[in-house]
Amino acid sequence: MYKGIFVTATDTEVGKTYVSCKIAETLEKSGINTGVFKPVSTGNRNDAKALIKAAKIDENTETVTPVFFKNPMSPYGASLLERRASDKIFDLKKINNAFKYFLNKYEFTVVEGVGGILVPLKQNFFVSDLIKKFNLPVIVVARFGLGTLNHTLLTVEKLKRDRQKILGVILSGKKNNNDVSVKSNALIIKKITNLSVLELGYNEKIDLEKNIWIIK
């Protein structure tokens, strides 16, 4: 089993926090001491609260999310709007120390990114750079419906170019029965990428035995 995973996504609001919580909840129920870590957040720290609740751990939101911007946008954009130097606010040393804290304290840590992999965290530093720095295997969260093929394949291609280990893709959210692409998207992604693909609708549980690739 790995020491942790990095959960990224094809876009914002595609179910990244939901999937991260489901993974943390499943691992905790399996008896695995699981930490959760969202290095940076904007708008609020509600994702950190949800992650803490899912993992059932005694941590505060400031520890789980050490870097925070009040405006709900990219961290770099928020730093410009708030007229704060992104290099000072987006403190990589602070993030690295927090990351090491979770890896040392917990058997397994679920790390959740922010937005997609090319969201700028500061000038010339993206989520993809943070993934490389942490060097954890990656799970890509994507939408079920129309348009997800392009977004998912672009994300996977970028990760492969960065030589990052990709564990698989999780399609999340509510299926639109009027969208015929929903019936074939998972299969097409699997055939093109040769990755494991899990379809996870809302309120569905993760069968860890059938989807052991999530942690191994």
UniProtKB/Swiss-Prot annotation:
GO molecular function: ATP binding; dethiobiotin synthase activity; magnesium ion binding
Statement: the UniProt record of this protein carries the keyword DNA damage: no
Binding-site positions, Mg(2+): T17, D47, E112
Active site per UniProt: K38
Binding locations of substrate: T42
Residues that, per the record, bind ATP: E13, V14, G15, K16, T17, Y18, D47, E112, G113, V114, G115
Keywords: ATP-binding, Biotin biosynthesis, Cytoplasm, Ligase, Magnesium, Metal-binding, Nucleotide-binding
EC numbers for this chain: 6.3.3.3
Official protein name in the record: ATP-dependent dethiobiotin synthetase BioD
Organism annotation: Endomicrobium trichonymphae
